[in-house]
Amino acid sequence: MSETAPAAAPAVAAPAAKAAAKKPKKAAGGAKARKPAGPSVTELITKAVSASKERKGLSLAALKKALAAGGYDVEKNNSRIKLGLKSLVSKGTLVQTKGTGASGSFRLSKKPGEVKEKAPRKRTPAAKPKKPAAKKPASAAKKPKKAAAAKKSPKKAKKPAAAATKKAAKSPKKATKAAKPKKAATAKSPAKAKAVKPKAAKPKAAKPKAAKAKKAAAKK
């Protein structure tokens, strides 16, 4: 009994190893099935719309016919076709001329290059920090103006100095005017001297009185 038990254990381990070896093969097969074969739906739609020569656009029914003619399974991938049309319209590669949503007619946009250029332009909010840098030179440019105003202020200071010199120049005129009354005073002094002379002439008038006294003495 002890000899037969170890022989049964390896027999059970062998089928388990075979099952583990088969599982990776199934996983590899699943990975191969998931890989997309051929171009995407959006590429097929753009090719079909660009190939059409209709001015009003390619209808959904005509688009499905073109895709089926190219070997695409339209019945299985009907939902993918509609999603692809909506995404192309939202991106701007296709323009919907009729209908709404995925139904209607579609054509290529006239200027697809401009639409692609506009999308990256919207992604430039990083240029906003440059505005404060542009304001700094403006403030720096304002400072020299203030300095220029400070330089102009000495001119204003010079004007009061010039006014002071003018006032100083005018002051001698006032001094000369004040000196003129002194000349008048000196001119008046001879008049006073002239007035003194008649006072000295009064003793001459006393002589007649002495003559009268002599006449009175002679009469006696």
From Swiss-Prot:
Composition-biased stretches (Low complexity): 1-19, 27-39
Q: Where is the H15 domain?
A: 37-110
Gene3D superfamilies attached here?
A: Winged helix-like DNA-binding domain superfamily/Winged helix DNA-binding domain
**Which example biological process does GO assign this protein?**
nucleosome assembly
Q: Which organism is it from?
A: Gallus gallus
List keywords of the entry alphabetically. Answer: Acetylation, Chromosome, DNA-binding, Nucleus
Subcellular localization, as worded in the UniProt entry: Nucleus; Chromosome
Q: What is this protein called?
A: Histone H1.10
Note the superkingdom of the native organism: Eukaryota
Q: Could you tell me where the Basic residues compositional bias lies?
A: 119-134, 142-159, 167-185, 194-220
Q: What does this protein do?
A: Histones H1 are necessary for the condensation of nucleosome chains into higher-order structures.
Q: Which GO terms describe its molecular function?
A: double-stranded DNA binding; nucleosomal DNA binding; structural constituent of chromatin
Upper lineage is:
Eukaryota, Metazoa, Chordata, Craniata, Vertebrata
Q: What is its main location?
A: nucleus
